[in-house]
């Protein structure tokens, strides 16, 4: 019997017991501390509640000692790995952060006042001062206002921004707010996945890595992160930047095993799943070509009229149906018929406003700030909300200064989802079902209960 068959059988028999303890499967987590040293294996797996996420490096194992991604380069003890944890698919999960708060007594560098708290002038020893990070996985992002271009000259914005609600106090703070010596707007966002980056750089729009698309290259992103988030006093050296970018672009993250579905990248399985398939595929194509999409999960489909196939095969059949929902179930977006895959495909890194941050479409979040955007009469209006918009994150507009960009967010990748809840840039979807329900409500799709379950199962194995 093949090794994968033994593994899958054992997984199905033992999943309940394994979830009940911090064993090979279940809710156990591994926190990677800056400067801890050791190797990150070429193929490393970490437990999560749905199975395991796997981090694969196509160039082999990496010695993390003295590596600039893993060593602190600033003054607050952080490294790149602090906010891009392998166990969380090279991002962070809110549940992991709550565990880390307890384990470290709130002293881990990830809770640094600069952006790991709701505002730096709050009492830093209180968990309430870090509530957005602990509950929603959100870091504070301070953006200059008015925005500055690449030459650091101010851009004349097409709109006026007013603070309507400020629960963190940072946007009205004398030191950190709009009336400070260096006027800034504080928004709160999830960290992006620092893996699978060839899927982002090879697309038609090129690299758009950050939530608002403000960094043109991975080198500039790393430089900004080290100067701001690590609070370094000097810029990273060219060699440090080279090593960071080299590491990030050879790394792949995806769910590797599921407690019900078994090994996800076993030989002969769907070519869309697992980091190994990603690393072997052509950059920007989700490891497969577009004409292969409809047949991706044929091997997991349930034959018509077949009896119950058992837990694993029934789950896999559900994933196959979920892929149909993702790739083929159409709905209306503005004037066109689209599918999930229309926007969430490899290489698609455009920014758009799907309503996650604008008050007219999103559920209200009293713990986040609220801004009123009033656009100039001469400006091109927002394509949906016109010239007066209420939002807790103006998105791309904070960089471009354009009214039409208010609320527009660069689409995030959807790999390793099971390892890094919550979802959306503002952490507003606590679960995958919350994410699906948002789209169903926002675009009046009309998913059936079965379609929702199948789509959820599909997303959890990516």
Segment roles from a protein language model:
Residues 1-9:
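Bacterial N-terminal signal peptides that target proteins for export
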